[in-house]
């Protein structure tokens, strides 16, 4: 078991480094509106200058993290988003094995745009997973008029997060695809309970946020990744992604490494790609420590025996 990390453009890395039908699953939290994670806007977020990121007012004296606005996309921004996810869909469709699943975190406002591009790339939509989580996103009073319109919210407070679930078409029947490619299905939570589309995990624990914050390459500017996902959630998804507990999971937008850490903790193999210098360095530093976090996923009956059957990355090359 192990992981390979690449610093660069995900689409270029996949094209140059990975063959067709070589990846078993994709689990990723891509740039939500794409425009938020352009270099200039990430720098504004880090400097707390706002821009397309909203810098929330303090709440009971507590400083709140910057949040993507999501509602500021122009027609040209939307076209960029469509082109981005069209390229993403085509890239992962090429490297995925037949029957390989794709788990994609998205937002209520944009998931229809993302879904359409994945459809057109030849992937099959299987479900929308619902992550229950109370966030500080949405529910805000009008910008610059908090007191004047104190009983007005610009949009609902978001209490759930959608994850699109897609699959590359099977090679024959499901059992044929499992036999040939080790893909096509989802790992059950137990013999009695299948994987479900209602996800627990809730808010990212403070201990995990601190791990990532401390992994920042510049101690004077240390801050956790703005969309850090909890290990419980990511291990739940990564456990489901490999039905036979064998294979390689790809995260082409790994951020500070939560997916890669989850895969590593489960004893699977992973490939992570990240374009941003700071996030890549954070991932390198944070992954080993995030992988040491305990979650309920490791208590499942099939977890202990999995280590005996684990393979290395080279077995799938």
Question: Which residues does each PLM region occupy?
Answer:
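Conserved SAM/SAH-binding loop
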Residues: 8-12, 303
């Amino acid at each position: 078991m192990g992981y390979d990390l690449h610093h660069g453009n995900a689409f270029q890395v996949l094209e140059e480094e990975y063959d067709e039908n070589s990846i078993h699953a994709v689990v990723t939290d891509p740039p939500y509106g794409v425009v938020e994670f352009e270099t200039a806007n990430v720098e504004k977020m880090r400097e707390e200058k706002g821009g397309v990121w909203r810098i929330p007012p303090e709440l009971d004296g507590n400083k709140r993290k910057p949040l993507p606005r999501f509602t500021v996309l122009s027609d040209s921004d939307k076209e960029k988003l469509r082109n981005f996810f069209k390229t993403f869909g085509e890239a992962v469709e090429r490297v995925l094995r037949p029957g390989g699943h794709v788990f994609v975190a998205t937002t209520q406002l944009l998931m229809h745009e993302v879904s359409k591009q994945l459809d057109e790339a030849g992937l099959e939509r299987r479900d929308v997973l619902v992550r229950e989580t109370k966030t500080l996103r949405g529910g805000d009073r009008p910008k610059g008029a908090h007191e004047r319109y104190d009983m007005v919210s610009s949009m609902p407070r978001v209490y759930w997060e959608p994850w699109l679930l897609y699959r590359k078409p099977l090679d024959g029947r499901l059992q044929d695809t499992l036999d040939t490619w080790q893909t096509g299905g989802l790992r059950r939570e137990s013999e009695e309970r299948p994987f479900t589309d209602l996800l627990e995990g809730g808010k990212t624990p403070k201990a995990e946020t601190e791990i990532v914050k401390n992994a920042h390459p510049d101690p004077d500017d240390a801050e956790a990744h703005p969309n850090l996902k909890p290990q419980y959630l990511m291990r739940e998804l990564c456990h489901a992604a490999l039905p036979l507990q064998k294979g390689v999971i790809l995260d082409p937008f790994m951020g500070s490494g939560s997916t890669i850490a989850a895969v590593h903790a489960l004893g699977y193999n992973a490939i992570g790609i990240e374009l941003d210098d700071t996030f890549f360095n954070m991932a390198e530093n944070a992954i080993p420590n995030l992988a040491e976090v305990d979650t309920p996923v490791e208590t499942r009956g099939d977890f202990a025996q999995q280590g005996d059957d684990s393979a290395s990355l080279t077995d799938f090359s």
